[in-house]
């Protein structure tokens, strides 16, 4: 009993020497962990948005696949390379829709210790493979068109070409209606401009733009079919259309390739201006300087940011963190943000590592 009293007294004596723990800072850290993901998803319905996007893409890709096969058959029967080129453009649309569907599926897979960013960039690799395959198909069609112009030994069935191209215009209109977004959505805490952009799924919007481009090409093929149907001696219009539409297909894929290279090289994504982000952070009260600002993207529609913010003395770090995060999220809707708060020192003005990148 005496030994218990002795150890109890010893414990009280040693405990009095332990420095006090700063509980408010611990509490703030817990709160910041609580709201950093909760507020990011509050007021939005990502799962229902993805389901709507999937339904639209399923319908459009099914229509696209069926008619692409029909155009290949019709182009073969009509001996028309222009229709074959239009089918190649449909292949571009179909491939982009498959990539979008794949990205919507793979983005729901959880990250692992090995793939700690998740599987987001599988979409980028698929897009690169799609572009390369389309270039091969287009190159073959251009080669055949050159051969036709040189030899002149070919016949085109104007009636079959006319029917097929007319159906192509109708099918592209149907696909456009299936992918068209009415613009109804929900917005909480964002500007009108930001909410109007966010309520449109980027995958569906990209597919819709592809279909509009293919519709214009199909109208061109239809005009060529009318010319050949009434004036069969003008059959050289077909290979000429093949050249023109091949340029259109390559132009479409070049924009995709540019986005792919930008993501793989971890460049600043489209829609996010480096200087604007920097000035927005410097406008937060208490922020004296910033450095190591990096902006890149996991995929085309998922920008990521990391930055070190230097704050003045006696400034609430958690308050600065909250304001900076809310402003960035409200204006740019970053997928992931990592913001490190540190104390400002005068030597940051002359430190080369603390200076921003060149233009």
Curated annotation (Swiss-Prot):
Cytoplasmic-side segments: 1-56, 108-123, 181-207, 258-291
Upregulating conditions: Up-regulated by dexamethasone (at protein level).
Entry binding sites for Zn(2+) 1: 89, 93, 210, 214
Modified residues (Phosphoserine): 283
GO CC field: cytoplasm; endosome membrane; late endosome; lysosomal membrane; mitochondrial inner membrane; plasma membrane; secretory vesicle; transport vesicle membrane
Motif Lysosomal targeting motif per UniProt: ranges: 281-282
Short sequence motif Mitochondrial localization signal: positions: 34-37
Keywords: Antiport, Cytoplasmic vesicle, Endosome, Ion transport, Lysosome, Membrane, Metal-binding, Mitochondrion, Mitochondrion inner membrane, Phosphoprotein, Repeat, Transmembrane, Transmembrane helix, Transport, Zinc, Zinc transport
Membrane topology of the entry: Multi-pass membrane protein
Entry's Gene Ontology molecular function annotations: identical protein binding; metal ion binding; zinc ion transmembrane transporter activity; zinc:proton antiporter activity
Gene Ontology biological process: intracellular zinc ion homeostasis; response to zinc ion; zinc ion import into lysosome; zinc ion import into mitochondrion; zinc ion import into organelle; zinc ion import into zymogen granule; zinc ion transmembrane transport; zinc ion transport
Membrane spanning residue stretches: 57-77, 87-107, 124-144, 160-180, 208-228, 237-257, 292-312
Catalytic activity: Zn(2+)(in) + 2 H(+)(out) = Zn(2+)(out) + 2 H(+)(in)
Residues that hold Zn(2+) 2 according to the record: 36, 291, 308, 342
Positions in the Lumenal compartment: 78-86, 145-159, 229-236, 313-359
Pfam families given in the database record: Cation_efflux
PTM characteristics: Phosphorylated at Ser-283. Phosphorylation at Ser-283 prevents localization to lysosomes. Dephosphorylation of Ser-283 which triggers localization to lysosomes, accumulation of zinc into lysosomes and lysosomal-mediated cell death is induced by TNF-alpha.
Tissue distribution: Detected in intestine, kidney, seminal vesicles and testis.
Location in or out of the cell: Cytoplasmic vesicle, Secretory vesicle membrane; Zymogen granule membrane; Endosome membrane; Lysosome membrane
Function: Electroneutral proton-coupled antiporter concentrating zinc ions into a variety of intracellular organelles including endosomes, zymogen granules and mitochondria. Thereby, plays a crucial role in cellular zinc homeostasis to confer upon cells protection against its potential cytotoxicity. Regulates the zinc concentration of milk, through the transport of zinc ions into secretory vesicles of mammary cells. By concentrating zinc ions into lysosomes participates to lysosomal-mediated cell death during early mammary gland involution.
Subunit structure: Homodimer. Interacts (via lysosomal targeting motif) with AP3D1; in AP-3-mediated transport to lysosomes. Interacts with TMEM163.
Family: Belongs to the cation diffusion facilitator (CDF) transporter (TC 2.A.4) family. SLC30A subfamily.
PANTHER family: CATION EFFLUX PROTEIN/ ZINC TRANSPORTER (PTHR11562), PROTON-COUPLED ZINC ANTIPORTER SLC30A2 (PTHR11562:SF51)
Protein known as: Proton-coupled zinc antiporter SLC30A2
């Amino acid at each position: 009993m005496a030994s218990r009293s002795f150890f109890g007294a010893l414990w009280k004596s040693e405990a009095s020497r332990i420095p006090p723990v700063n509980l408010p800072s611990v509490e703030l850290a817990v709160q910041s962990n609580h709201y950093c993901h909760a507020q990011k998803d509050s007021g939005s319905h990502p799962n229902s948005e993805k389901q709507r996007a999937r339904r639209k893409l399923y319908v459009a890709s099914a229509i696209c696949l069926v008619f692409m096969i029909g155009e290949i058959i019709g182009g073969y029967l009509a001996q028309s390379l222009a229709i074959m080129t239009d089918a190649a453009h449909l292949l571009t649309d179909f491939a982009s829709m498959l990539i979008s569907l794949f990205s919507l599926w793979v983005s729901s897979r959880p990250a692992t210790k090995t793939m700690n960013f998740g599987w987001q960039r599988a979409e980028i690799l698929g897009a690169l493979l799609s572009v390369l395959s389309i270039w091969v198909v287009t190159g073959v069609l251009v080669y055949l068109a050159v051969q036709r112009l040189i030899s002149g030994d070919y016949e085109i069935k104007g009636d079959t070409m006319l029917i097929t191209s007319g159906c192509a215009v109708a099918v592209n209109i149907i696909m456009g209606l299936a992918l068209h977004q009415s613009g109804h959505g929900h917005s909480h805490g964002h500007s009108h401009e930001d909410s109007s952009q966010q309520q449109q799924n980027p995958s569906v919007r990209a597919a819709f733009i592809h279909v509009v481009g293919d519709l214009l090409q199909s109208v061109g093929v239809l005009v060529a079919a009318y010319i050949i149907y009434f004036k069969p001696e003008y059959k050289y219009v077909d290979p000429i259309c093949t050249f023109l539409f091949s340029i259109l297909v390559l132009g479409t894929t070049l924009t995709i390739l540019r986005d792919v290279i930008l993501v793989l090289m971890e460049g600043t994504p489209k829609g996010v201006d480096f200087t604007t982000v920097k000035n927005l952070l410097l406008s937060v009260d208490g922020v004296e300087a910033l450095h190591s600002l990096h902006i890149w993207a996991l995929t085309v529609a998922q920008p990521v940011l990391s930055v070190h913010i230097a704050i003045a003395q006696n400034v609430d770090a958690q308050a600065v963190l909250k304001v900076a995060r809310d402003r960035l999220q409200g204006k740019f809707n970053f997928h992931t943000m990592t913001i490190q708060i540190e104390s400002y020192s005068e030597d940051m003005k002359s430190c080369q590592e603390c200076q921003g990148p060149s233009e």
